[in-house]
Amino acid sequence: MATGKIVQVIGAVVDVEFPQDAVPRVYDALEVQNGNESLVLEVQQQLGGGIVRTIAMGSSDGLRRGLAVKDLEHPIEVPVGKATLGRIMNVLGQPIDMKGDIGEEDRWAIHRAAPSYEELSSSQELLETGIKVIDLMCPFAKGGKVGLFGGAGVGKTVNMMELIRNIAIEHSGYSVFAGVGERTREGNDFYHEMTDSNVLDKVSLVYGQMNEPPGNRLRVALTGLTMAEKFRDEGRDVLLFVDNIYRYTLAGTEVSALLGRMPSAVGYQPTLAEEMGVLQERITSTKTGSITSVQAVYVPADDLTDPSPATTFAHLDATVVLSRQIASLGIYPAVDPLDSTSRQLDPLVVGQEHYDTARGVQSLLQRYQELKDIIAILGMDELSEEDKLVVARARKIQRFLSQPFFVAEVFTGSPGKYVSLKDTIRGFKGIMEGEYDHLPEQAFYMVGSIDEAVEKAKKL
């Protein structure tokens, strides 16, 4: 095992000199004793003359020139497998939840090749989430990628937690949650929420918070992904949650600047598309198992043409747009049914009935949007009988798109509901065809299946 010494420290960038015949490879992990703690460095560049440029995975405070550095001769390796479930780990796979060692059987390197073309699976199978608006309007593909776009406080995290809960309980699947550049408080809240919902033993949590150095935040998504790949290769269907993919890009920008690369558009790193591609190409399904990923996407200054969200868009199969306007009506989940899209919403994939129902719901809601201006100026009485019917049905649909969540029971006071896709299609189709025109619209608010709405109407 070769040993070198530190020759230069500039913030998170550390240059290390090795003997000419024992220079570490790019992405190898190096270890240095910094006081009582050991710090891991990752090689980014070979500068020649036996010197390598590295990025620190932790604080570089206290490092000085001349300190001995050990080459571990392999990339950063993290624990994988069932031992990671229910635990909180950092970028190096070390536990940070005070519950002792992880006791893993296996460790995998975080830098891995994406599955080869032959291994990829081309199944068009849908992943039922039990959330009506998502299953109907923007269905998820098993092994697909979903972007959750939304501002602060419209429910990105609650939606994520409900998805983890539904898949853990209804599909007995495992999930991996990677908090990339997260607020520490959010990570803490998330942990307690998972504990209260009794699904912690089905989730591995990997955190690299906002206060960590950029190298740490850039690699933490790969750590989470590696754990998910292990579950996939065991033949499981896994969910990978990344919150927030924008901060992964931002960490890459910081590292790129520290390494002295020329910035490109808007100051982003010149390798933005490649870095995003390296991550996204590994999040895929093979013939053994699938990884379905849900990624929260922060949109800087609400500009979807910003290079970061624009690069992310290219990789997504479905986009779930959370709307503040819908949240203000008290309709949760606040998914915008006219703005959210999915590649799976195709009659060849979901079937003609599902497709027609979803498009019918969209056209009714679109017509209602157009009629709103007329209603605001002239009132309901000026509408034709046909338009009055459109408004009545659209308002029922709008309310029926709401749903009580299991993870939000403490706020809503009503028990959570899981609605099968069959019941979802039946309900919306019935409303559009006028089967429930005689029921009051309040009966459709915060219920699960259409049968519950009928029951609720009897009590009103």
UniProtKB/Swiss-Prot annotation:
GO molecular function: ATP binding; ATP hydrolysis activity; proton-transporting ATP synthase activity, rotational mechanism
Cell compartments where the protein resides: Cell inner membrane
Catalytic activity: ATP + H2O + 4 H(+)(in) = ADP + phosphate + 5 H(+)(out)
Major location category of this protein: membrane
CDD domains named in the record: ATP-synt_F1_beta_C, ATP-synt_F1_beta_N, F1-ATPase_beta_CD
TM spans (from-to): none
GO cellular component: plasma membrane; proton-transporting ATP synthase complex
Xref: Pfam families: ATP-synt_ab, ATP-synt_ab_N, ATP-synt_VA_C
EC nos: 7.1.2.2
Topology of the protein relative to the lipid bilayer: Peripheral membrane protein
UniProt entry keywords in alphabetical sequence: ATP synthesis, ATP-binding, Cell inner membrane, Cell membrane, CF(1), Hydrogen ion transport, Ion transport, Membrane, Nucleotide-binding, Translocase, Transport
Subunit structure: F-type ATPases have 2 components, CF(1) - the catalytic core - and CF(0) - the membrane proton channel. CF(1) has five subunits: alpha(3), beta(3), gamma(1), delta(1), epsilon(1). CF(0) has three main subunits: a(1), b(2) and c(9-12). The alpha and beta chains form an alternating ring which encloses part of the gamma chain. CF(1) is attached to CF(0) by a central stalk formed by the gamma and epsilon chains, while a peripheral stalk is formed by the delta and b chains.
Free-text function comment from the UniProt entry: Produces ATP from ADP in the presence of a proton gradient across the membrane. The catalytic sites are hosted primarily by the beta subunits.
Family the entry assigns: Belongs to the ATPase alpha/beta chains family.
Protein's UniProt name: ATP synthase subunit beta
Native species: Enterobacter sp. (strain 638)
